[in-house]
Amino acid sequence: MVDIILFRCLGQLHFTQGRNHILLNGRPLHLRGTVENAVFPKTGHAPVCDAEWERIMRIVKDYGLNHIRFHSWCPPAAAFRMADRHGVYLEVEMPMWGKDAEPDEARYDFFRREMRAILKEYGNHPSFVLYCNGNEITGNFDFIEELTADGRKLDTRHLYSGSTARTRVPSDQYYVSQQTNKGPVKVYEGRPSTDWDRSKESDVDVPVISHESGQRCVYPDFREIGKYTGPVEARNFELWREMLTANGMGDQAHDFFRASGALTVVEYKAVIEALLRSSKSAGFQLLSLNDFPGQGYAPVGVLDPFWDLSLIHISEPTRPEPIS
């Protein structure tokens, strides 16, 4: 006789909506997150094995973050399992972006079925805290409200939002945005200081999470070209290297990378500290901890697209003391 032991992940977590914060078991939770843009150059698709997602979750925690927003996509089961294991809170979305909510009944039916499938398949994971329909949506917001309200009725274990960074809907339980009706909550500019924050702008009727904070670009590191060994090639890097060489500055490429990278780290520090000072901020989502080689090219991370340590660092990150 063979004994078969089945393991199922269970979590004794209770997430609720507070005035300014998401509450975890009744206590305010400040989300410190990064945006995951489905960037996997080695394979061209998201990993489905536990090992790779465990690596990503460990990196996220090593940098003092506790949250990942999956930008207009839902990750595979392995991501949820490893987030459960390492205590990373997830925002999950459908593949809805921009004009996807324009009138189209066939598309609407797909989104209704997709939302139900996500909640049914992954709803039991304690790491699945936030659900949002998608990114910067425009179009028919009556449909967005329908989806959001239906989600709240179907599964009360999560908090729901209609869209990031655009129109609010009545069923929103949190709001990811760069701006509220009281002003900007994302820090793009400001004189160097230690006292400015975004408390006033974040003080609305639902918790506000700063949308895609950061976006400070670093000069490309052409040494990354050799890492693109899969279906994705760094043709853009090759063109930029040729242009720099043609203009007589090819030997300065690494200096440009180091200088812009050092400035980016300083700017990210200022942005994060301002949001941490904002007592009424529910959190932030960086764009992003790793570079985003899509939608053009956005080298906005302190890690490269492979989640590897970028050479702009002086030293390895030090794991901070555990905080919620």
Model segments located where?
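Hydrophobic alpha-helical segments that mediate membrane insertion or helix-helix packing
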Residues: M1, F80-A83, I314
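N-terminal carbohydrate-binding accessory modules
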Residues: M1-V60
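Hydrophobic pocket-lining residues within nucleotide cofactor-binding pockets
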Residues: L10-Q17, S213, L289, P317
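Substrate-binding/catalytic cleft of secreted carbohydrate-active enzymes
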Residues: M57-I59, H67-D291, G296-L303
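Active-site charged/polar residues at nucleotide-handling catalytic sites that mediate phosphoryl
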Residues: Y63
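Short, low-complexity, polybasic intrinsically disordered segments
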Residues: V302-S310
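Single conserved hydrophobic/aromatic residue that forms the stacking wall/gate
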Residues: I312-H313, P317-S324
